[in-house]
Amino acid sequence: MAEFGRNKKSNGKKFTKEYKVKAIQQNITRKARLKKEYLKALKEEGYAVPEKETSRREVNVKKLKEDKRLEGKKKIDEKKELKKQRKREQREKLEERRRKEEEKVKIIRQKEQEREQKRRKMTKRTRSGQPLMAPKIEDLLSKIKNDDTYTL
C-alpha cells in the first residue's frame, strides 16, 4: 500500500514528546543565535546596543516565586509545629496517666502494708497461746478518737 505522502524517515515521530522537545530546543537556540548576530551587527555598524534590562515582569515573577516559596515553607513549619505540639501533648497525657497509675499502685501497696501490720498486731499471742488484749484495745481507742460522733 502507498504511504500517502508520509516520509518513511519520520515514521510518525513528529507527534512524540521527544521530537517536540527537540524542536523547541532547536527553535530557542536558533532565536538566540539570530539575536546574537543582530546585536553584533549593530555594534559593528556603530549603533547603540540596547542593554539587557530586567523587566518588571521578571522581577515580579521572581518576587512571586520567592513569596510562594516562603509561604510554602511557613505552612510546612506551621504543620511541623502543630505535629510537635500534638506529640508533646500526647506525651504529657501519657506521663500524667502513668504517674496517676503509679500513685494508685503506691497507695494500694501502702494500704496493704498497713492492713498486714494491723493484722499481725491483732493476732499476737502470749506464750501460753492467749490473745493479747492491748493491741485490740488500742485499735478500739483509735477508732473512737477518729470517729466524729464522739468528739465535741
From Swiss-Prot:
**Which biological process annotations from GO are given for this protein?**
maturation of SSU-rRNA from tricistronic rRNA transcript (SSU-rRNA, 5.8S rRNA, LSU-rRNA)
Q: Which InterPro entries match?
A: Fyv7/TAP26, Fyv7_fungi
**Keywords assigned:** Coiled coil, Nucleus, rRNA processing
Give start-end positions of Basic and acidic residues composition bias: 66-81, 89-117, 136-152
Predominant location category: nucleus
Query: Where does it localize?
Result: Nucleus, Nucleolus
Does the record bear Endoplasmic reticulum in its keywords? no
Region (Disordered) residue spans: 66-152
This chain belongs to the protein called: rRNA-processing protein FYV7
Native species: Candida glabrata (strain ATCC 2001 / BCRC 20586 / JCM 3761 / NBRC 0622 / NRRL Y-65 / CBS 138) (Yeast)
Question: What taxonomic ancestry is recorded?
Answer: Eukaryota, Fungi, Dikarya, Ascomycota, Saccharomycotina
